[in-house]
């Protein structure tokens, strides 16, 4: 196979020459991604920033930021968005012990996801489940068969879960050096294996050895080896601190493992901070705790209270900028701000969906 890099560099150089002198830096694909992210965030108002940090982001038309729902599903196919190839559940895929096969499955899922997305954008469809950020795989440890979501996992073994999870992430995200085919998300971080009815106020207290040898290896592997683009925090608390604001977990992600993506809460977990756990007095206080801890995106909140938190002095706008920048980086890596001609996955046709080859 001939390398893609010279062609990509040529395309970028030609595009850079064609850009107008007044083109914003964030719109220039020849610029480093971090510089583009910083430039884009600097152009946003506080209310616009807050509106972009929830799953149903409204978008900012004046800057070309699209309306987008970060909530999409692809556990074993993209059938939530209509007809698609549906593969066996994760627990069955894991039973094959064949990580190459799981990689191929995820590669096909990513291709069908891009096909659906490309067609949706062509028809101005911005609905949930037609996006490219997928909250999968579920790499929790399936220890108790009474847990109602065990079939979503790769089983009870941390090594097998790591191998299956890394293979899935690499297949889904693709191998292009510049762009993601789709963005995967490792969930639920951490020690989320039931009991399901108590998940909004349950405090997990695993033995430290069990914590590090059983519950963490898959997450570490997906971050370090799989370069997973997102991590979702769990509803439960861990050692007395809700996972959405747990400094132990964020220290592992950002400082020990070198995570370079974005962190999203499970749906409604910010509300849990002031209703179930009562570690904050209200929504603004909860948002301040979450953003400061390391959370970038919240799911299930109809209206973000981040702007209110800043205006009340509970949070610095620079802290918001840091977390929003992580989100925007994912958008850049998916090619949302670049001409389709530069994004190799933008050409995947809808005919790939539920194709005989898959």
What are these regions (language model features)?
Residues 7-17:
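Bacterial N-terminal signal peptides
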Residues 19-358:
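Glycoside hydrolase catalytic-domain context in secreted enzymes
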